[in-house]
Amino acid sequence: PHQLVESFKSTLDEVREADILLHIVDISHPNFEEQIEIVNKTLAEIDGLDKPTVMVFNKIDAFNYEPKEEDDLNARTSLNNSLEDWKRTWMGKAEHSIFISTLKKENWPEFRELIYEEVKQIHSKRFPYNNYLY
């Protein structure tokens, strides 16, 4: 939440030391898009946007939406998007994003592989002649 950001800025300064950021999003929260925006603004304020970031959309098991009836003439809102709809947006198309359920371990092997590949890439750049680990 934005009201807590100021008190946590010193903690968030650790972002500058990180090699990779995991941006964990509670996709079941009705305002998750706003929360993403707040995190991105905060990262920009502390010069943290230049870090490799993996977007992790968690709690897919708890995700709910309001299906839009075919005869409903009201404008479609983000509340009408199914999980599959969200996966067809930038959220699912981004190279470094994944939809998971930590509770039910859905897409857990894919998540682990994604993190492994990201760390491997960073390690290979930092230590180019030390690839025996992979």
Enumerate the language-model features and the residues they cover.
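Short, solvent-exposed loop/turn segments at secondary-structure boundaries
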Residues: 1-4, 33-34
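Inter-motif core of Ras-like GTPase G domains
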Residues: 4-29, 41-49, 101
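C-terminal-of-GTPase-core extension/linker across diverse P-loop GTPases
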Residues: 30-134
